Amino acid sequence: MTFALNMLRYRAPPASLFVGGIAGAWLDSFDRTTLSQDSAGATPVTATGQPVGRISDKSGNSNHAIQAVAAARPSYIVANGLSRIRWDGVDDRLSVTVPVGGFTGTMVLGTDQGTASYGVTIPAGAYDIGGRGGLYFPGNAIVGQVIRNGALSAQEAAATEAYFVENGATAGYGSVTSFTNFWRNWSELTSFPLIDTSAGTNFINAWFDCTSLTSFPLIDTSAGTNFINAWRGCSGFTTFPLIDTSAGTNFSAAWFSCPSLTSFPLIDTSAGTNFSFAWFSCRSLTTIPAGLFDSVQGGNFTNAFASTALTQTSIDNILVSLVASGIAAGTRVFDQSGGSAPSSTGEAAITTLRSRGWTVTVTGGY
């Protein structure tokens, strides 16, 4: 009952989130009274198709989102009774000048593709609304965004999400099939929500260079086939969850340069054909479980484990697993450097692989 009352309370515009001068920004694309065609706020937006050079901040902090360059202004769009600001995916963006001290707290973002709450740390200076450089954004249009210095409670976050959904945002990401570049270079993210990704097939570059994430939720990736660069450069990861990758075929550079990752789970690689550079430069990676590659469908492991720190048991596990796969046609390359050389068990596996046409390079030069 208390939760329901709180939800009702916050379905009104979330002004209470900023009571007492709490820092942050509250930007609504559906409240046309806050939209201007120019960055100074002199020319109001009055019709669909007009450019947006300013969204006035409704938090009381005057952290307005502006764009002084006319060619980089997004468009105000009204379709099916819903008001949104649409990005061109090239250079459109608005910028908030984050004050000294920055923001550490919660960001709630409502878009045409989905709505979610994130933990963030945003340093002082210019911060892009509309994705990094106008390129990377989880949707095509924004409905609203709240950034608060100080974490929102679960109830506050849920109610703010509901507020955006009631005003035209899509409730979840459950209908999205391609997450390509959605959160790429979002280095401000410190935590990622358990959103619905069950329809996702394409995760290319989805979390590329989310450098401040230290963990990742057990999202549903059961339909995912393409994971190229998906978590590349997530330098804060120390572990990775046992997500469902049973449909995954391409894992090229998926965890490239995750230098804090120390171990890896026994994910399902049974449909995988390409693992080139998958764990390249994971310099702290020591532990790979036995059987990880027993059922793979292809042998492209070019530089897959170069610049890692694998234990002898782990490199043996990998080599024995590749033998178990039975791959004897197509691309057959395996590279490891750094870490331990294989034992006699691993060396025997290398001999078998080479007899099947594999090119194998390992620490120690066997």
Residue ranges and their predicted role:
Residues V52-V100:
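Low-complexity, glycine/proline/serine-rich flexible segments
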Residues L8-T34, L82-L152, A169-A171:
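Extracellular glycan-associated modules
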Residues D92-S95, S117, A126, G131-A141, ...:
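Repeated polar recognition positions within modular binding domains
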Residues F3, S16, A341-Y366:
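Extracellular/surface-exposed low-complexity segments
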Residues T2-Q67, A141-G144, L152-G172:
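GGW-centered surface loops in extracellular recognition modules
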Residues F264, N303, R332-Q336:
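Conserved hydrophobic beta-strand positions in leucine-rich repeat
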Residues S29-Q37, G41, S59-S62, Q113-A116, ...:
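Acidic glycine-/aspartate-rich tracts in secreted/extracellular proteins
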